[in-house]
């Protein structure tokens, strides 16, 4: 039930953002606000405190964000406060990002390497997966020294693990089976 509501809120906000041609702005602002929740324990406690009434919470948000975020986004936040759903903002943002990717015919992938890939190498990987999925691919690249070498790629349900670490583990398993 909770996820259903989060999707509905996300879709409603996405449609407003899309109508106003501010999808990227809303996503960026929501991310920043969620980061404030995550990084500022006192702020989170005030928002979560049952004895602080809705009017005070709304005033706090107005004081903090009026003039810094779009008025319609601020109004949306007021609705979340009224409905006691402001603490689900991260989940609503996650759903909104999924909607955005879907509307842009895009999926996310992860590329892990020991050293950064050259732009050309990343573009080659991207082209391979875009052809396979017939979607745009957005890769999150991560440096992971524990891989020892090679590359790890995950897109959708596909995983390509060409890392030295995985090869060593495979050899270790083979050697242990033979004993």
From Swiss-Prot:
Gene3D superfamilies: N-terminal domain of the delta subunit of the F1F0-ATP synthase
InterPro entries: ATP_synth_OSCP/delta_N_sf, ATPase_OSCP/d_CS, ATPase_OSCP/dsu
GO molecular function ontology, one term from the record: proton-transporting ATP synthase activity, rotational mechanism
SUPFAM superfamilies hit by this protein: N-terminal domain of the delta subunit of the F1F0-ATP synthase
Keywords: ATP synthesis, Cell membrane, CF(1), Hydrogen ion transport, Ion transport, Membrane, Transport
Subcellular location: Cell membrane
Bilayer topology term: Peripheral membrane protein
Cellular component GO terms held in the UniProt record: plasma membrane; proton-transporting ATP synthase complex
PROSITE patterns: ATPASE_DELTA
Family as reported in the entry's similarity comment: Belongs to the ATPase delta chain family.
Known function: F(1)F(0) ATP synthase produces ATP from ADP in the presence of a proton or sodium gradient. F-type ATPases consist of two structural domains, F(1) containing the extramembraneous catalytic core and F(0) containing the membrane proton channel, linked together by a central stalk and a peripheral stalk. During catalysis, ATP synthesis in the catalytic domain of F(1) is coupled via a rotary mechanism of the central stalk subunits to proton translocation. This protein is part of the stalk that links CF(0) to CF(1). It either transmits conformational changes from CF(0) to CF(1) or is implicated in proton conduction.
Complex formation: F-type ATPases have 2 components, F(1) - the catalytic core - and F(0) - the membrane proton channel. F(1) has five subunits: alpha(3), beta(3), gamma(1), delta(1), epsilon(1). F(0) has three main subunits: a(1), b(2) and c(10-14). The alpha and beta chains form an alternating ring which encloses part of the gamma chain. F(1) is attached to F(0) by a central stalk formed by the gamma and epsilon chains, while a peripheral stalk is formed by the delta and b chains.
NCBIfam families on file: ATP_synt_delta (TIGR01145), PRK05758.2-4 (NF004403)
Name of the protein in its database record: ATP synthase subunit delta
Organism the protein comes from: Clostridium beijerinckii (strain ATCC 51743 / NCIMB 8052) (Clostridium acetobutylicum)
Gene name of the encoded protein: atpH
């Amino acid at each position: 039930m909770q996820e259903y509501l989060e999707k509905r809120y996300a879709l409603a906000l996405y449609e407003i953002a899309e109508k106003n041609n501010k999808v990227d702005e809303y996503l960026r602002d929501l991310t920043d606000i969620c980061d404030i929740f995550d990084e500022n324990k006192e702020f989170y406690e005030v928002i979560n405190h049952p004895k602080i009434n809705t009017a005070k919470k709304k005033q706090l948000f107005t004081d903090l964000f009026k003039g810094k975020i779009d008025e319609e986004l601020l109004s949306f936040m007021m609705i979340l406060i009224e409905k006691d759903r402001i603490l689900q903002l991260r989940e609503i943002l996650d759903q909104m990002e999924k909607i955005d990717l879907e509307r842009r015919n895009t999926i996310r992938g992860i590329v892990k390497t020991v050293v950064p890939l050259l732009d050309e190498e990343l573009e080659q990987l991207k082209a391979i997966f875009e052809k396979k999925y017939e979607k745009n691919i957005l890769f999150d690249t991560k440096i992971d020294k524990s891989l020892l070498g090679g590359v790890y790629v995950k897109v959708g349900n596909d995983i390509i693990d060409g890392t030295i670490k995985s090869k060593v583990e495979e050899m270790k398993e083979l050697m242990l089976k033979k004993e």
